[in-house]
């Protein structure tokens, strides 16, 4: 697993964030039943994803935190449960740490919107064929949701790749990858 320290300048109280991307999910059962939108977010971790989360939970860096905050999405929450059991950290579920929102249905539309998002540096071009959450909206959503945790110096945040990418320069973020950064909340 890769570990990095990234400094970011924002307004307010300085907080060390230990970002963790969730483990590999298994969408098969939900896809077989044609779940879409937030329904697909009910997917649990795959067998490999559980192994990744178990390995992640051995990371000594996680023990340096004061609190564990997780997205309410099943794959993130299941990953966080392994971390909570291994570290004894108190766990808070934060519904606003969900994955990037695309206001179109279907995997194909999601991927097309993702390509458009990346090509436009996170902005939504005028007359875009796809509607989605911009990078600025994601950053704002994250910062607003984390304000209530200002009294904690170091927080583990189990969340999703697109949200993490708004705060760290990594283009590729693997399942259960750990990335440290400091953010002004």
Model-identified regions with their sequence ranges:
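Short, active-site-adjacent cap segments at secondary-structure transitions
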Residues: 26, 76-77, 100, 163-165
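Short, well-ordered beta-to-alpha junction loops that form the rim of enzyme active sites
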Residues: 70-74, 96, 158-162
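Active-site-proximal alpha-helix that buttresses catalytic centers in soluble enzyme cores
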Residues: 16-92, 176-179
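His/acidic metal-ligating clusters that form di-metal
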Residues: 143-150, 157-162
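Histidine-centered catalytic micro-motifs
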Residues: 19-24, 158-164
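Acidic, low-complexity terminal tails and accessory targeting/binding regions
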Residues: 3-16, 59, 92, 97-114, ...
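Glycine-rich phosphate-binding loop signature in dinucleotide/nucleotide-binding domains
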Residues: 61-64, 149-153
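Phosphate-handling substructures
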Residues: 29-30, 34, 39-44, 85-141
């Amino acid at each position: 697993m890769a570990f990095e320290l990234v400094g970011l300048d924002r307004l307010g109280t300085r907080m060390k964030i230990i970002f963790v991307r969730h483990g590999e999910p298994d969408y098969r059962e939900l896809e077989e039943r044609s779940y879409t939108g937030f329904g697909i977010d009910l997917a649990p971790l795959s067998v490999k994803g559980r192994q990744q989360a178990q390995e992640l939970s051995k990371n000594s860096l996680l023990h340096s935190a004061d609190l564990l905050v997780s997205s309410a999405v099943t794959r993130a929450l299941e990953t966080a449960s392994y971390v909570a059991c291994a570290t004894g950290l108190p766990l808070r579920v934060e519904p606003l740490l969900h994955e990037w929102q695309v206001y179109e249905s279907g995997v194909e539309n999601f991927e097309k919107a993702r390509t458009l998002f990346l090509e436009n540096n996170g902005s939504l071009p005028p007359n875009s064929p796809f509607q989605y959450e911009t990078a600025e909206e994601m950053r704002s959503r994250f910062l607003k949701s984390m304000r209530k945790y200002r009294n904690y110096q170091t927080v583990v945040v189990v969340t999703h790749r697109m949200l993490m990418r708004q705060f760290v320069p990594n283009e590729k973020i693997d399942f259960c990858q750990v990335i440290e950064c400091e953010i002004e909340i």
